[in-house]
Design a protein with these regions (language model features):
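Secreted, propeptide-processed cysteine-rich mini-domains
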Residues: 4, 9-14, 23-27
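Long, low-complexity or tandemly repetitive, helically biased scaffold regions used
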Residues: 28-32, 41, 46-51, 60-63, ...
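Short, solvent-exposed mixed-charge patches
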Residues: 372-374
Length: 374
């Protein structure tokens, strides 16, 4: 958990707190059943005065009627006026791993992630369940689980681990009393959704270690990347934190031994497997457009993007056909990768810290402990 404080500081820096995303989009798989209008689901657009000077455009006009969003309230700030020159040195191409066209600036918006915390929103029921059912069905639906190939098992473990992490985030910051706007921990949810299913805990650790592994393998690229936002002091801090993370002894020792599953990405079937998994992530990314909760959609897209970036790195570095090629990551991919790593780190830490209480609840739990559907 030595890495967690570094990640917490890193994602608060100007470079890593803004994520480019398409929030308003049509569901390509089933008729749109409407947006979630709970106040905790929304992401609101805030006046220019809430953002640092380098992130403003003089041509942008705001009326006196602009909504003011305050930190600590459910709504969060959206910056639609970020100057692309702030992030010089980064390529701007459509990401083949995601469904949305990230070069379509008219449809994209910049979101301040620090003012849009991932937590309980009230989004649940059949609509939310349909999302996860669709995501899981992207994994080898034509085969029963016992016949899954190794790469499909890896994909399932990654999605299950991400699902577990999101459940932990909701349980760790839950709306206990809406009338008093009281937030706290829902330990029963943590126990029911994650702890009493050992495979879900294992998959959480698996995805955490895989993303860590990807970060270490991209260390040379990430160290040399430009984290320029126009704020010299903050940019130096960002570069320092990135180096602290990349060359931390705990990180290097934790990721020294490669995953056995990485071997499936090598050999003559590597290119076909890459294309297959890339298409799966495009489909999963498209499913995120069907999420009825705007804030949930934001974090779903970010974390799917981050996981796709981790796999992109591992495919590239472990591939035998990339000797003369240079790893290229988009700015948005790097932001998603580090924010995903931070969210996974937060989940692992919370599960670890709550372990004694969970074990106590387990001893007093008389219900079956076998697998149950999500």
């Amino acid at each position: 958990m030595v890495l967690h404080p570094i990640l917490q500081d890193l994602v608060k820096t100007p470079f890593f707190r803004y994520f480019k995303v398409k929030l308003w989009c049509d569901c390509p798989f089933w008729p749109d059943d409407g947006m979630c209008y709970l106040r905790d689901c929304t992401v609101c657009e805030c006046p220019e005065s809430e953002f640092p000077e380098p992130f403003k455009k003089s041509s942008r006009l705001f009326s006196a009627d602009d909504v003011i969003c305050q930190e600590g309230k459910p709504q969060a700030a959206v910056d639609r006026t970020l100057d692309d020159t702030i992030f010089k040195g980064w390529i701007q191409i459509d990401n083949p791993w995601t469904y949305d066209d990230e070069t379509d600036d008219a449809a994209m918006t910049y979101v301040n992630l620090q003012l849009n915390p991932e937590r309980y929103t009230g989004y649940a029921g059949p609509s939310a369940q349909r999302i996860w059912t669709a995501v899981y069905k992207e994994n080898c639906p034509q085969y029963p689980s016992e016949e899954w190939c190794n790469e499909k098992k890896v994909m399932y473990k990654l999605i299950s681990g991400l699902h577990s992490s999101i459940s932990v985030h909701i349980a760790s910051e839950y709306l206990l009393d809406s009338s008093a706007n009281l937030w706290g921990q829902n330990v029963q949810m943590l126990y029911d959704r994650v702890w009493k299913h050992p495979d879900r805990v294992r998959n959480l650790y698996f995805i955490f270690l895989l993303v860590l592994r990807a970060v270490t393998k991209a260390a040379d690229y990430l160290e040399q990347a430009e984290y320029n936002t126009g704020n010299h002091v903050e940019d130096l801090k960002t570069q320092s934190l990135v180096r602290q993370l990349l060359y931390n002894n705990k990180l290097l020792s934790a990721c020294r031994v490669p995953f056995d599953e990485v071997n499936i990405w090598q050999g003559q079937n590597g290119p076909d497997l890459l294309q297959q998994i890339q298409n799966q992530f495009r489909n999963i990314s498209a499913i995120m457009n069907c999420v009825g909760c705007e804030k949930c959609r934001l974090w779903g897209k970010l974390q799917v993007n981050g996981l796709a970036t981790a796999l992109k790195v591992l495919f590239f570095v472990d591939g035998k056909n990339n000797v003369n090629k240079t790893l290229q990551l988009q700015r948005n991919e790097v932001i998603a990768l580090f924010n995903l790593l931070n969210r996974l780190s937060q989940s692992v830490k919370f599960v670890h810290d709550m372990g004694p209480l969970m074990e106590k609840m387990e001893r007093h739990d008389s219900s079956p402990t076998g697998k149950t559907p999500w």
